[in-house]
């Protein structure tokens, strides 16, 4: 995984973001509601778009649009009516864009609940859209994807544009012309569809504004026809040849305004000669444009938002799904193709509450920390090579004891997380002396940081070590497993659970072939109560107070005070041991995704059904005893899972010394195995939390999204609709005038969105062309 180091000194990765909800889903990935962990913006809520690199790379044009979105967001940062970018980073398999969370949700949702807007409400939205689009054009950007789903309302009711994946950014010296056939077909202008030889300009966005204006005032789409064919080709033909079927009852000025925006002849279109044409139209005469630019117009629609995590104005089909970080394959040359993607907003650069702030990297560090007991005793290696690791709460660096030059690793934690560091130190002190547990040598504290000085381990992590071996046998795997089981048993005997057992937390003391392993990172370890009464009491406390396991895959319930949390005990550690053993012997992670299209929910289902097998060439030479042990550890029911006593007495651990047949693991172990392992562990923890009762994937298919959203409306606390007459969209008949009905009840078989591709408003598949 790539951690992003900005010139100002900050790194961000998935460990800095806890997944809370799913906000949207599309062809290339998902949009999550996330909480920031650590740093100056600790606990801030954001929206994170996560894209799979393998899917982005399916088309050259899609790759170009993805990279362009990141550039456009940086260029537009700080613009009032546009969603702000805060971070962009990548892993080996995915791209991440972290933006502000606009809690009022999609304009689409609000229009669905009302049927259509009155003139005052529509005029307000249109005015702010004019300002927003003009701000794009002033910055040399064509939006190209203005539609209801990409218009958000903030908590005050002001407009925010999102999703700039199809935007075109013109660089200095470039002609302000584009050529791509891209966007959502019912919002495309004739010149985008026809693509004249000279390309098209930003005037295409004013056409899309005309479509939006029509939809706001009628609840209907101007170029779709009920009872007729509504393929992309059919819609495109109507855009090119048909007149807009205005209702006879539409306001005269509104009709003229929309008609001029939807003028097929480019030179006659409103906005062709500049934005002032639009601002000066009679329909917009009541707008104070200075106030509009300053966001001081009084919003007509103000969303009623209950709390920071309120997602009522986003599709329930997505928000009801578990927020799982699904596995993905790593494409070849990904780092080269996506170089320069990363970004951290200047407004969130860490200060003194960073896990390790800029103050430790300053030239005058000795003067700054003259009173620090750590710096009086140790010299910190501030070079790139001295950085050994980084998490959400800490960094690990190489250090040298001043008196004798002895080398150590120091875990440095901000005083903001001093209580967690002190707890980790106490647990480490309790488990000292075991040969397979990292040794704690010293503990220090100063006004800025908490320091855990530990032995330095120069060997590799478990899977990396195996990957580098030319020959790896079942006997050697058993030796590793014996050491690991010994360490975990030592913890459990002291009523301690590790809660984060995974290959990257298993390191070796050196690169020597006979080196012993060490279990490291006790940041999420906890003491178990000694009696059932204490245990029940402790579970209640833990449910309210303690986040646990690897935070980049942590569930929202584990991070939110007052929410429920899985009941962790020794059984979770034992299950993790089973996954480690399976991976060592086969080079594969059990329950892992069988295809790139597979969801994390499906992984959870396989975990709950214990669906793993010993088929394939990798298992040919693996002993029956090893398979028996894995089966016992990966048993779903914790009451039937192998106990620690049964594990230590198992035949395989006692009699595997003679099994010298080479395993295929070193040659087939993928580079993404660590990430896949973590995703599998997180899926298990989700399932464990829910008592292994899973959401049926068929209950929320993507194809139902439009139908669900059309039926959205105000609901009471029980979830029942307050209005039995559900508002639905309808399509106007082609080539004739249609009367507007005053009734909000519309035929259930009609809907302006029925024809659309089932793509999210924030992530979609785009059509490519030879030029951008």
Curated annotation (Swiss-Prot):
This is Putative ribosomal protein S6 kinase alpha-2. Keywords: ATP-binding, Kinase, Nucleotide-binding, Phosphoprotein, Repeat, Serine/threonine-protein kinase, Transferase. ATP binds at residues 23-31, 49, 388-396, 411. Activated by multiple phosphorylations on threonine and serine residues. Pfam families: Pkinase, Pkinase_C. The active site is at residues 145, 500. The gene is rskn-2. Serine/threonine kinase that may play a role in mediating the mitogen- and stress-induced effects on transcription. May repress transcription via phosphorylation of 'Ser-1' of histone H2A. May phosphorylate histone H3. Residues 285-353 form the AGC-kinase C-terminal domain. Its cofactor is Mg(2+). The keyword Transferase applies. InterPro entries: AGC-kinase_C, Kinase-like_dom_sf, Pkinase_C, Prot_kinase_dom, Protein_kinase_ATP_BS, Ribosomal_S6_kinase_II, Ser/Thr_kinase_AS. Residues 718-727, 739-748 have a biased composition (Polar residues). GO terms for molecular function: ATP binding; magnesium ion binding; protein serine kinase activity; protein serine/threonine kinase activity. It comes from Caenorhabditis elegans. Its EC number is 2.7.11.1. It comes from the Eukaryota. PANTHER family: RIBOSOMAL PROTEIN S6 KINASE.
């Amino acid at each position: 995984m790539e951690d992003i180091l900005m010139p100002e000194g900050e790194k961000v990765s998935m460990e800095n973001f806890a997944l809370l909800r799913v906000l949207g889903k599309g062809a290339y990935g998902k949009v999550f509601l996330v909480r920031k962990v650590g740093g100056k913006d600790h606990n801030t809520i954001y929206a994170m778009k996560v894209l799979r690199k393998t899917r982005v790379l399916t088309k050259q044009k899609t790759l170009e649009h993805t990279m362009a979105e990141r550039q456009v967001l940086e260029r537009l940062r700080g613009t009032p009516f546009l969603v702000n970018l805060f971070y962009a980073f990548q892993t080996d398999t995915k791209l991440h864009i972290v933006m502000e969370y606009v809690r009022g949700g999609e304009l689409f949702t609000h229009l669905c609940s009302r049927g259509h807007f009155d003139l005052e409400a529509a005029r307000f939205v249109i005015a702010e859209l004019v300002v927003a689009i003009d701000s794009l054009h002033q910055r040399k950007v064509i939006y190209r994807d203005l539609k209801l789903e990409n218009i958000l309302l903030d908590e005050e009711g002001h407009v925010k544009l999102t999703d700039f994946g199809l935007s075109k950014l013109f660089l200095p010296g470039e002609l302000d012309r584009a050529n791509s056939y891209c966007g959502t077909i019912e919002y495309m202008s004739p010149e985008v569809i026809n693509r004249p030889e000279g390309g098209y300009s930003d005037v295409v966005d004013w056409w899309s504004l005309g479509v939006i204006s029509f939809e706001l005032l009628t609840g209907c789409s101007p170029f779709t026809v009920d009872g007729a064919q509504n393929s992309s080709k059919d819609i495109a033909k109507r855009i090119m040849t048909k007149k807009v079927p205005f209702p006879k009852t539409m306001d005269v000025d509104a009709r003229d305004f929309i008609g001029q925006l939807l003028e097929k002849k480019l030179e006659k279109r409103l906005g062709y000669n500049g934005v002032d044409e639009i601002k000066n139209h009679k329909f917009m005469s009541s707008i104070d444009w200075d106030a509009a630019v300053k966001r001081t117009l009084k919003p007509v629609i103000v969303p009623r938002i209950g709390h920071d995590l309120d997602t009522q104005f986003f599709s329930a089909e997505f928000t009801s799904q578990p927020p799982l970080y699904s596995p993905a394959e790593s494409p070849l040359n990904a780092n080269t193709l996506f170089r320069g993607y990363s970004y951290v907003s200047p407004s969130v650069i860490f200060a003194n509450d960073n896990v390790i702030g800029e103050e430790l990297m300053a030239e005058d560090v000795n003067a700054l920390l003259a009173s620090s007991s750590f710096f009086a005793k140790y010299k910190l290696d501030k070079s790139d090579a001295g950085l050994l690791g980084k998490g959400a709460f800490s960094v690990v660096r190489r250090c040298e004891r001043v008196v004798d030059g002895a080398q150590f690793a120091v875990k440095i934690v901000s005083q903001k997380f001093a209580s967690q560091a002190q707890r980790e130190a106490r647990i480490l002190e309790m488990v000292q002396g075991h040969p397979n547990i990292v040794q704690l040598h010293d503990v220090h504290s100063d006004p800025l940081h908490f320091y855990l000085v530990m032995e330095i381990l120069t060997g590799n992590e478990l899977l990396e070590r195996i990957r580098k071996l030319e020959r790896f046998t079942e006997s050697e795997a058993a030796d590793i497993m014996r050491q690991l089981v010994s360490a975990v048993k030592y913890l459990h005997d002291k009523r301690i659970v590790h809660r984060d057992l995974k290959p990257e937390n298993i390191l070796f003391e050196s690169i020597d072939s006979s080196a012993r392993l060490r279990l490291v990172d006790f940041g999420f370890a906890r003491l178990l109560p000694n009696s059932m009464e204490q245990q029940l009491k402790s579970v209640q406390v833990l449910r309210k107070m303690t986040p646990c396991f690897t935070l980049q895959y942590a569930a929202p319930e584990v991070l939110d005070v007052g929410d429920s949390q899985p009941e962790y005990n020794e059984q979770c550690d034992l299950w993790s041991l089973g996954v480690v053993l399976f991976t060592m012997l086969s080079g594969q992670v059990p329950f892992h995704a069988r295809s790139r299209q597979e969801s994390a929910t499906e992984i959870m289902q396989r975990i709950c059904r214990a669906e793993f097998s010993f088929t394939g060439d990798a298992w040919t030479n693996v002993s029956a005893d090893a398979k028996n042990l894995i089966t016992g550890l990966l048993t779903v029911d914790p009451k039937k899972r192998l106990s620690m006593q049964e594990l230590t007495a198992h035949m395989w651990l006692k009699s595997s010394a003679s099994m010298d047949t080479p395993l295929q693991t070193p040659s087939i172990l993928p580079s993404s195995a660590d990430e896949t392992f973590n995703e599998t562990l997180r899926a298990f923890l989700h399932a464990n939390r829910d008592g292994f009762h899973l959401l049926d994937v068929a209950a929320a298919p993507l194809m139902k999204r439009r139908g669900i959203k059309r039926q959205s409306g105000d609901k009471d606390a029980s979830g029942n609709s307050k209005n039995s007459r559900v508002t639905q969209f309808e399509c106007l008949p082609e080539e004739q005038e249609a009367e507007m009905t005053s009734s909000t009840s519309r035929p259930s078989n009609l809907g302006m969105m029925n024809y659309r591709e089932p793509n999210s408003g924030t992530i979609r598949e785009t059509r490519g062309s030879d030029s951008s």
